[in-house]
Amino acid sequence: MTTFNPDIQYVMQQDKDDCYFGRYPTLARLNKEYCNTASVQWLNIQIYNLNEYCGCKDKMTQQQILDCARTISGMYYFLKVSELMLFFFRFKAGFYGKFFGSVDPMVITTALSQFCKERGEANAKHDNDIRMKQINEFRKNAISYEEWKKTRNKKSNNTNTTQ
């Protein structure tokens, strides 16, 4: 878990395909492998970092950070830590709006909902790319019906002449 600390968000975001499709643990996996609060503990660190990053005068309290971490862990247990690191980096970069006056957990969870839509689009594109690659591979060896009939007739004629 310490491998995925906020300091590597910048490195992780450089390869968004790896964030989306790489072999990284999900929040649910963290809970299963370590303890059932591992994802909340990990998210606490990420959210605290975001809280400190923002230039807002009014920061979230420890309780708000904890509640936000629990909400994300409960609702988005299927997200990989790499995806969440991409999200937090993008949030800091202003992809999902900004805070007005105070750091608001609702802004974070609303932004995460938007991120999940983007994730869905990336997954659909990825699946489509894989499908197209398979189709193109199939086409390399494919023949038309007419070519198949000619091949079949040749085989049939060869069989008849050898008998």
Language model features: what each stretch is:
Residues 1-163:
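Charged interaction scaffolds used for protein-protein
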